[in-house]
Every structure is written in structure tokens, then in C-alpha cells.
From Swiss-Prot:
Active-site residue numbers: 64 (proton acceptor)
Designated name of the protein: Uracil-DNA glycosylase 2
UniProt superkingdom: Bacteria
Pfam family, one: UDG
Places the protein is found: Cytoplasm
Species this chain originates from: Listeria monocytogenes serotype 4b (strain F2365)
Keyword Cell cycle attached: no
Keywords per UniProt: Cytoplasm, DNA damage, DNA repair, Hydrolase
Underlying gene: ung2
């Protein structure tokens, strides 16, 4: 039984008994037994564990976890301490520096954002080592769509940051006029120069939150 330790337990309890999820669970059992899979089994739901639904102010949507050793720990774009900062996150830090003058930290550990109400959610929560998108289409997308739908129902305003085509597909789930979404290309080096750099999503997010009487996010990640 999955224990998230906050309001997500009640909000998702029916979901974890759905046939698609039970099938996904069997698939994951086999994958973890026979393959190298990231993140660690106990880190799969960290995004939900760190950020309760009632606390969500911002959602940053990723695709699937990093597939290199020691990187993924259940939060989109974040890596564990002591691991080299991946290129997409380097570009996020660069945009933060240009937008809000944040210093570029020496690590990619984004727990500080999660603690402030930034839900760092991948649309697929597991991946085989070295094989991007290897767990796509197994059922994770149904669950993460449901999570987005639940957040969409919140009364308090939420900002959705949707970077890249995969993330932009989720716009159709956002029907609540209280929320807003900012979209751009993905921060990957392949696309960042085509509209991510200079998007000012971080200052725009804080502006929206403040206009709605919500405490803004301190985006500065401390160096370790």
C-alpha cells in the first residue's frame, strides 16, 4: 500500500485500486526485479510526498526521470546532491539568473522549491537505466493526468509551467479560470534558445501569485 503521508493519500486512494494502476504495479514489480530502473523504488512518489495538494502553488511538469546513475530522486528536473547538474537544469538556472538575478548554485537538488509548494511532477514516474521513455505508455500518464485534474479543481490559484510539447499537451486538462499556465519550448540545449531563454516564467509566476494574495516562491537554490 502506498503511503504518501499527506492529503494525496485520500485524494488518490481510489486511483491506486484502478485496473490500469494494478497492471502498472505488476509491470513495475517485474522491471525492478529484472532491470536497473530509476529512481529508487522508495523515491517514485517523492513529488507528492514533499508537496501536499493543499500546498501546491506551482506545477513544473517534466517528462520521465533522468536515466543516468544516481540522478533521479522523484522530482522533475532535480538531481540528488553530489551529482553533476544536467544540461536542462543548467538552462533553468541560467534563465533564473537572467530573470530574477538568482545566483547559480553548485547543485541540482530542488527540494527547497518542493518545500514551498512547487510540485515537481514528471508525467511518467519511472524509467529503465539508459533508456529514455522506456516506461511510457504503461499507465503512468493516466495517474499523472488525474493528479493534474485534481490540482485543476483547487480553489486557490496555481501556476502551471509547461515546457516542451509533451507538457503543453496537458493544457487541455486545465479548465479552471483561477489558474494560469505559461508555456515555452523545453529547456533542453536542443531547444532552449528557441524561446525558453528569456521567457521570464519565474518572475511572471511570482507576479501572478502576488496579484492573487499568495506568497511568492523564493527561487534561489542554496549552494551546498
Amino acid at each position: 500500500m502506498i503511503k504518501l503521508g499527506n492529503d494525496w493519500d485520500e485524494l488518490l486512494k481510489d486511483e491506486f485500486n484502478q485496473p490500469y494502476y494494478l497492471t502498472l504495479r505488476q509491470f513495475l514489480k517485474k522491471e525492478y526485479q529484472t532491470k536497473k530502473v530509476f529512481p529508487d523504488m522508495y523515491d517514485i512518489f517523492n513529488a507528492l510526498k514533499y508537496t501536499a495538494c493543499k500546498d501546491v502553488k506551482v506545477v513544473i511538469l517534466g517528462q520521465d526521470p533522468y536515466h543516468g546513475p544516481g540522478q533521479a530522486h522523484g522530482l522533475s528536473f532535480s538531481v540528488q546532491q553530489g551529482v553533476q547538474i544536467p544540461p536542462s537544469l543548467q538552462n533553468i538556472y541560467l534563465e533564473l539568473h537572467n530573470d530574477l538575478n538568482c545566483e547559480i548554485p553548485n547543485n541540482g537538488y530542488l527540494i527547497r522549491w518542493a518545500d514551498q509548494g512547487v510540485l515537481l511532477l514528471n508525467t511518467v514516474l519511472t524509467v529503465r537505466a539508459g533508456q529514455a521513455n522506456s516506461h511510457r505508455g504503461q499507465g503512468w500518464e493516466i495517474l499523472t493526468n488525474r493528479i493534474i485534474e485534481i490540482i485543476n479543481q483547487k480553489e486557490e490559484p496555481v501556476v502551471f509551467l509547461l515546457w516542451g510539447n509533451n507538457a503543453k499537451e496537458k493544457l487541455q486538462l486545465l479548465t479552471n479560470p483561477k489558474h494560469t499556465a505559461f508555456t515555452s519550448v523545453h529547456p533542453s540545449p536542443l531547444s532552449a534558445s528557441r524561446g525558453f531563454m528569456g521567457c521570464k516564467h519565474f518572475s511572471k509566476t511570482n507576479q501572478f501569485l502576488e496579484q492573487n494574495g499568495v506568497k511568492p516562491i523564493d527561487w534561489q537554490i542554496p549552494s551546498i
